[in-house]
């Protein structure tokens, strides 16, 4: 889908210029409501959102007259590696950061090279960096960038969605149909609601108010459920914050994948196979309370966000010393050229391998045809011999 450039909208245009302007990281075109749950978690700490900043184009963001925009940077980064580092006008609070290779590059060095030089310096100015998972922390530490394990900002979601429900219900979010049916058969006389975080529809930034209402509706559903079974981090972690008993399912029995590292320990966990075999340590009739381990992370996250907002409003956050625009462009151009060279090298190697395989196939086909002809000749001779 071709992206049409759009002016960054203001959520709450102010009649007077405030002492500080605040930005909110969002994904402009969205098909996973989990991204909006992350944005909602950051929004609760801001006096207002003066700017919505497109996560995938954070480098090209421009504020009015270049004014500083104080922004909590909790998000999944490097899905669009060409768009790092953030624009100079963004004054960041780096926490709940997740860096991942995504699908843009196939080689490890092509991914992490954007954390060298200016890309890494953008983080070093604000050390230590709050990392959502241990794998992200290890990646940054390998680049000599100091970190701390912050967990996800959704751990701070407020428990404000409690309401009376006519009949008890449970939720199964983004799980296999077999899991949903097993839960229905084993949870007693409780309605089981199926939830999809990715429903196939794409919502644009012009639907922001509608997207926020959808997040609040989803969180209301989760907070009032008897329990939740899910494969989604951005279901499981909000349920921790909301106090709803939750079981996180993942195919990796070690729970050591990039996204789960350090976070799975906060949750009740099982594989789908363990659940279906009745081996999960999670009673659907009397669901266990969530582990309290996340509370220390929640407290520090709240402290960091409030201190950041207070300092921004007080004007005590100094302007950083930044490279010139020319230096940034030259650095990014060099990184892009290097990445392109690597990709072209990979393409050339793939083409050579394809040529080799094609030649092997042609030789195999030729050998097969020769064998078939020989078999035909032998069969014909056998037939002649029988007639004699």
Which role fits each region the language model picked out?
Residues 3-372, 376-383, 387:
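Active-site anion-handling motifs in enzyme catalytic cores
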């Amino acid at each position: 889908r071709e992206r049409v450039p759009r002016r960054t909208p203001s959520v709450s245009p102010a009649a007077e210029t405030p002492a500080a302007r605040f930005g909110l990281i969002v994904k402009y075109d969205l098909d996973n409501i989990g991204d909006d749950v992350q944005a909602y978690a950051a929004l609760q700490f801001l006096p207002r959102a003066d700017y919505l900043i497109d996560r995938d184009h954070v480098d090209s963001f421009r504020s009015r007259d270049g004014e500083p925009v104080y922004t909590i940077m909790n998000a999944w980064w490097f899905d669009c590696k060409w768009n790092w580092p953030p624009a100079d006008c963004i004054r960041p609070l780096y926490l709940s950061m997740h860096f991942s290779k995504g699908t843009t590059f196939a080689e490890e060095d092509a991914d992490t090279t954007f954390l060298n030089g200016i890309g890494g310096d953008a983080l070093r100015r604000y050390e230590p960096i709050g990392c959502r998972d241990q794998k992200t922390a290890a990646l940054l530490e390998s680049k000599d960038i100091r970190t701390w394990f912050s967990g996800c900002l959704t751990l701070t979601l407020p428990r404000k969605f409690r309401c009376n429900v006519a009949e008890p219900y449970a939720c199964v979010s983004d799980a296999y149909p077999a899991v949903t049916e097993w839960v229905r058969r084993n949870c007693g006389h409780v309605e089981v609601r199926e939830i999809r975080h990715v429903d196939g529809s794409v919502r644009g930034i012009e639907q922001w108010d509608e997207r926020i209402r959808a997040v609040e509706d989803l969180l209301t559903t989760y907070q009032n459920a008897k329990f939740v079974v899910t494969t989604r981090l951005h279901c499981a972690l909000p349920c921790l914050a909301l106090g709803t008993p939750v079981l996180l399912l993942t195919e990796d029995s070690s729970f050591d994948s990039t996204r789960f590292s350090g976070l799975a320990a906060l949750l009740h966990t099982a594989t789908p196979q363990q659940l279906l075999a009745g081996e999960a340590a999670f009673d659907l009739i009397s669901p266990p309370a969530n582990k309290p381990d996340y509370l220390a992370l929640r407290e520090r996250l709240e402290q960091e966000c409030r201190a950041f907002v207070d300092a921004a409003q007080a004007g005590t956050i100094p302007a950083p010393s930044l490279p010139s625009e020319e230096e940034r462009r030259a650095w990014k151009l060099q990184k892009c050229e290097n990445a392109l060279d690597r990709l072209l090298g990979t393409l050339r190697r793939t083409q050579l391998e394809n040529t080799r395989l094609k030649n092997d196939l042609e030789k195999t086909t030729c050998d097969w045809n020769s064998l078939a002809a020989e078999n035909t000749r032998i069969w014909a001779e056998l037939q002649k011999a029988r007639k004699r």
